[in-house]
Amino acid sequence: MDLGHSLFVVFTCFLMARCRTEIGKNITVVVMLPDNHLKYSFAFPRVFPAIRMAHDDIQKKGKLLRGYTINLLNHSTESQGAGCSESQAQIMAVDTKLYEKPDAFFGPGCVYSVASVGRFVNHWKLPLITAWAPAFGFDSKEEYRTIVRTGLSTTKLGEFAHYLHSHFNWTTRAFMLFHDLKVDDRPYYFISEGVFLVLRRENITVEAVPYDDQKNSDYREMISSLKSNGRIVYICGPLDTFLEFMRIFQNEGLPPEDYAIFYLDMFAKSILDKDYKPWESSDINWTDPIKLFKSVFVITAKEPDNPEYKAFQRELHARAKQEFSVQLEPSLEDIIAGCFYDGFMLYAQALNETLAEGGSQNDGINITQKMQNRRFWGVTGLVSTDKNNDRDIDFNLWAMTNHKTGQYGIVAYYNGTNKEIVWSETEKIQWPKGSPPLDNPPCVFSMDEPFCNEDQLPVLGIVAVGSGLALIIFGISSFLIYRKLKLEKELAGMLWRIRWEELQFESPNKYHKCAGSRLTISQRGSSYGSLITAHGKYQLFAKTGYFKGNLVAIKHVNKKRIELTRQVLFELKHMRDVQFNHLTRFIGACIDPPNICIVTEYCPRGSLQDILENESINLDWMFRYSLINDIVKGMNFLHNSYIGSHGNLKSSNCVVDSRFVLKITDYGLASFRSSCENEDSHALYAKKLWTAPELLIYDRHPPQGTQKGDVYSFGIILQEIALRNGPFYVDGMDLSPKEIVQKVRNGQKPYFRPTTDTSCHSEELSILMEGCWAEDPADRPDFSYIKIFVMKLNKEGSTSILNNLLSRMEQYANNLENLVEERTQAYLEEKRKAENLLYQILPHSVAEQLKRGETVQAEAFDSVTIYFSDIVGFTSMSAESTPLQVVTLLNDLYTCFDAIIDNFDVYKVETIGDAYMVVSDSQSRNGKLHAREIAGMSLALLEQVKTFKIRHRPNDQLRLRIGIHTGPVCAGVVGLKMPRYCLFGDTVNTASRMESNGEALKIHLSSATKEVLDEFGYFDLQLRGDVEMKGKGKMRTYWLLGEKTDVYVI
């Protein structure tokens, strides 16, 4: 009984543990929103499809929360007929927490509902993500520490207003008018709240006046208050009330040119829905609307213009119709749904990191901390959060840009990430008075200043003021004239000019044997980069020289002469003025025909392309991000300088100096640039791999390029650094540069771009690449954005400059150590091969003497045995065969012979045609064994030749004839080129005669050899008799038949 009870308890515990494990794989997300989509831009029909889209993307792609299932629950926070309900939101939050155990909340949207639920989730330590709730109060993280806002924040709007005031020098006062019914969600109150509080925080006096159109607010009283309190006006309320205010403003006769009126219209209903003319939405009979609205500006949220947002918008509307039967029209309100989508992705990323670190899925404190100071690309563009978990929002500033038609255009936008206003280069504010109005004009709000008295200034005062003004005008004029004269003097002085005679091409101190450095040069003439020719890529020595004792890089210009126009002089002056750590320093230019060249700073480490293509250099990601950061810094400075753009940015134009700092070269001096490639040359297309699509349509695009074109080129360089597979690498496709350029130029969707591989680099880097090489130049980020983005990616790069430099030096030293070790091993291997070759050419003892540098002396030997052989009938066989067949025959035969003689103590002296000569005891001094070794070798060769097959004549038998003789010789090395080990003496001649007087397939030997072999007693010899030898007379000779099998050999 006890055993059964124990088993039951164990089984129950197992089931409970298993159930708890399965539950842990589920993530429950509660979405709480109102239902009325006509009233709320964050209602269920608008937002829930976006959240479901994010949910589906996460579950399908599997990159985030792999193995987890996300369950979405939805609850309404709206009371029937009453709009947003704070109590309903509280009840739904508590019930959900008790019965459904959620891991996160999304919504509710309404400010008061978010505030009440936010206090609960703060206590439960669960995250609450919303894309609305703009109230200033949520900045308090002591009370709302787990709230994350991925949409509009009134604080961010206030910061934009503050930057506007700083730009226009409005530092004293402002006036605010906002609509407030004090019921429901009070959207206009909370939107204007941030502007009021931020300006007040900056010591600007702000008079705020609420109004309620349902209580017949007196607009004339508002106008009276406005006249007494401000000239910089902010109005936040329904469009019809704003236009009514402007009608009264006009009727009261206020001069609009003295005011700057900003209408806070977050969703641009006054602009986008009204043909870009705000006043056309009402039936008001305007006297002169264009004159009136010249001083009216509209501040809206900035609509994302990336392709992902457009696709998201289309799918959002389709899902709203399918799931809620609601027909949505495209509007700026869709950005709220997009921000909820990005908020869901932000939560998924933070949760994924928490789980990967072993954390809990309901640890809201840790999860929300991971959402702080984060940056990634979402459907609404760059998503950047601050330390308060509020998203950095961008805003547009609209103004009347066409004073004839009255149409509005965007004159600036506020970059919330960079905290700066970016002014349009084409659309400008046209102030009625030519300059912004004053926020605190003299003698209007205060009469305390002395000059506000109606009495006229005394004569002395008038004289003093006039004299002062005259002195100021004289001083300004003198300064301008001085600057003009100084500029002309600099242009005429030509401080940049270098005479050809001043350049030296040998070291003044003769320290270096050559002035070249192992860099690469481009076909266009750059001192750096890989030389790409029609036949491939080659590394050459860059042209370098010495100027005033310093080593410099010299780039020759393919022009007959340079016309020194004023434009060229200004280009040269600007080049001389540019000084930055990440740009190569311009030293000067030589314009003496035909030696026209540009002289720049010399960087000894080579180009970035060289480093990437050198597989022996190991680049970790800290080093790579450091190189990327150097490029971004250099290009950001260049784009903000007089030069403006590069026009030919590529990896070969990024060079590394001795301190491993990357610098950009070959910029500026557009007048010096020329092209010498043939129109259809391989090099021309290879050079265009970095060129943006919009510039490829030109046969010769502007030499100075464009800033957006430089961003595209930077994207290609990013891919080079990330994959190290060369420029414009496309996985699985082997295309020529011409084919690649033509595909990019065609511009057909899907756009042809290089391969990204998130297994080799981060997903954020892939997003940055794709953003940089976007087809539409307007979609590409500026280098100011890229700089911040890269700094965010390069978390390790936040260390000091010294630590970064030391890290680079350490990595380079490690690379050098590995390279030295590899080169040493390669050297030893080549040395071994050379020694083996030497041992094959010369005897071992002679080779050792030569290696030691000793002179090889001729040497006499008392007794050696020499072997000669040739092939009987070889001449006729050669006549009947092709030369290639003869070579093949001899190679096969001698390869076979060489393998056999390795088994004997012999040395092959030479082969001449079919003749084969071998000697024994010329170096080893093996007593009388030399005769035995040659005899044994001869028998082995004769046996092998009987089975040898001729490839082209397989039925023919090779007939080998062998001759052997023993006697004294003299040996030595003859010659310096191709030295040969030669034997001299009558023994050599006699051995040759023994072979020539022998018979096929027999071994013919002399009596001298026979006497030595008899001492061994196991060779079978047969007397041939006396044979007449040329020059020798008659000699008694013998046949070697084989070895005796019945004799025991010791």
UniProtKB/Swiss-Prot annotation:
GO aspect biological process, one term: intracellular signal transduction
Catalysed conversion reaction: GTP = 3',5'-cyclic GMP + diphosphate
Compartments in which it is found: Cell membrane
Record topology, Cytoplasmic segments: 482-1050
Post-translational modification (record): Phosphorylated. Phosphorylation of the protein kinase-like domain is required for full activation by CNP. Glycosylated.
EC category: lyase
InterPro entries: A/G_cyclase (IPR001054), A/G_cyclase_CS (IPR018297), ANF_lig-bd_rcpt (IPR001828), ANPR/GUC (IPR001170), Cyclic_nucleotide_synthase (IPR050401), Kinase-like_dom_sf (IPR011009), Nucleotide_cyclase (IPR029787), Peripla_BP_I (IPR028082)
Gene Ontology cellular component annotations, sorted alphabetically: plasma membrane
Keyword Acyltransferase found: no
Transmembrane annotation, as ranges: 461-481
Domain Guanylate cyclase: 865-995
Keyword match rRNA processing: no
Ranges facing Extracellular side: 20-460
Signal peptide: 1-19
Membrane topology: Single-pass type I membrane protein
Record-annotated Protein kinase domain positions: 517-790
EC number: 4.6.1.2
UniProt induction comment: By osmotic stress; levels decrease under saline conditions.
MF term (GO), any: ATP binding
Cystine pairs: 84-110, 236-339
Family: Belongs to the adenylyl cyclase class-4/guanylyl cyclase family.
Function: Receptor for the C-type natriuretic peptide NPPC/CNP hormone. Has guanylate cyclase activity upon binding of its ligand. May play a role in the regulation of skeletal growth.
PANTHER family with a match to the protein in the record: GUANYLATE CYCLASE, GUANYLYL CYCLASE
Name of the molecule in the record: Atrial natriuretic peptide receptor 2
Organism expressing this protein natively: Anguilla japonica (Japanese eel)
